[in-house]
Amino acid sequence: MSARQHTPDLRADGFTFKRFFIAHDRCAMKVGTDGILLGAWAPLRHESRILDVGCGSALISLMLAQRCEGRVPVDAVELDIAASVQAAENVAASPWRDTVVVHQADIVEFSCTTPHRYSLVVSNPPYFAAGVACASPQRTQARYTSSLSHEALLHSVSAVLMPEGRFCVVLPSQIVGDFLFLAESLQWHLALRVDVADNPRRPVHRVLLALTQAPIDPVYSSALLIRDELQQYSPDYRALTQDFYLSM
């Protein structure tokens, strides 16, 4: 059966998309809007190879594989053993089992040993500074930068990104300024920015960024509302995610 013909069965133990299923009961971070936003938005050009840093359940990896119609190899790197096993199972059950490869590895070590270079790197990274521990060490690792600092992440991506490649991330709005200041100090350049709000009455809470190692002029900025005044999905959000959500 081809990828285009594949229709996943509805199941209660994860999240069913139009063309694949994500089980996430062994992953610290469940399927959520952040990952869906990044997987649907990350700009695709003429990609040769894609890297997903901290892939979790492999959600973003499989979204990108779908968008590329399985023509572009995707390496999905995940430090947590349980999450990496589940990610590999999700990939194996998808139409892109021959396209996406899950690596149980630390991205710092992976970036030093992989022979590949990437035209696109994506990450939904840890974003909180060390604080009150979460209920499980697995969730603490996924949420706090003590497991992967933003500086280490930027250095690791720099080591494997092609000269004209792009690094795309999704971050909480309150830390974007510090992240961009750090990135610029490490010779990264902002290419694209999207400020995301839940609805017109709510402030921006997430930001999508595309960074390059070559200066880009001009920098493109835009805004995205997830829901409208009536709390229905906005036309822009529907257009962005309609290839994935069953309800769209």
From Swiss-Prot:
InterPro entries: DNA_methylase_N6_adenine_CS (IPR002052), SAM-dependent_MTases_sf (IPR029063), Small_mtfrase_dom (IPR007848), tRNA_Adenine-N(6)_MTase (IPR050210), tRNA_adenine-N6_MeTrfase (IPR022882). Its EC number is 2.1.1.223. Pfam families: MTS (PF05175). The keyword Cytoplasm applies. The keyword Transferase applies. GO terms for cellular component: cytoplasm. Its main location: cytoplasm. Keywords: Cytoplasm, Methyltransferase, S-adenosyl-L-methionine, Transferase, tRNA processing. CDD domains: AdoMet_MTases. One of its GO terms (molecular function) is tRNA (adenine-N6)-methyltransferase activity. It comes from the Bacteria. It catalyses: adenosine(37) in tRNA1(Val) + S-adenosyl-L-methionine = N(6)-methyladenosine(37) in tRNA1(Val) + S-adenosyl-L-homocysteine + H(+). GO terms for biological process: methylation; tRNA processing. It is found in: Cytoplasm. HAMAP family: tRNA_methyltr_YfiC. Specifically methylates the adenine in position 37 of tRNA(1)(Val) (anticodon cmo5UAC). Belongs to the methyltransferase superfamily. tRNA (adenine-N(6)-)-methyltransferase family. This is tRNA1(Val) (adenine(37)-N6)-methyltransferase. It comes from Musicola paradisiaca (strain Ech703) (Dickeya paradisiaca).
